[in-house]
Amino acid sequence: MNGDDTFAKRPRDDAKASEKRSKAFDDIATYFSKKEWKKMKYSEKISYVYMKRNYKAMTKLGFKVTLPPFMCNKQATDFQGNDFDNDHNRRIQVEHPQMTFGRLHRIIPKIMPKKPAEDENDSKGVSEASGPQNDGKQLHPPGKANISEKINKRSGPKRGKHAWTHRLRERKQLVIYEEISDPEEDDE
């Protein structure tokens, strides 16, 4: 291995990196006046570059992200009269419609069907557990509603503090853990 070869490649890499950096800085400089840009330190400029890069990445993934504050001023001027067809962020928002909670709630089916409380107490399929541990025993008394029924009643139309509690479910079979001994320990 010749050490001179590794150092010979380094200036080209630095030139590419500085070219990318200057291109990114020029892109960010459009959001600020020349006076503001000259006052800024290098660390502030690079943080704005990363902020814009993160914003673009998140919008490409389809997330609804608030526009960074320094970019809001530029878009306000674009609304006043500039052509919007060249704005990359605008195209991304059009291509990826934002998913709201209401749409998501309609798309995802509910796990537990809603039934009146009388029907749930009469049906034994919900209150009984089949399996070797329980042998068909009831998990809760027939007169009382189980925990999942209470949660389902509370989370119906209210949808306030506990919006996702309707997804909780009660275990049908008890989980019993046993200690497994090693065969080597048994030999001793």
From Swiss-Prot:
Keyword Phosphoprotein annotated: yes
Keyword S-adenosyl-L-methionine: no
All residue ranges annotated as the KRAB-related domain in the record: 20-83
Record-marked site positions (Breakpoint for translocation to form the SSXT-SSX1 fusion protein): 110-111
Composition bias type Acidic residues, residue spans: 179-188
Any GO BP annotation: negative regulation of transcription by RNA polymerase II
A molecular function GO annotation: transcription corepressor activity
Protein's recorded name: Protein SSX1
Source organism of this protein record: Homo sapiens (Human)
Gene: SSX1
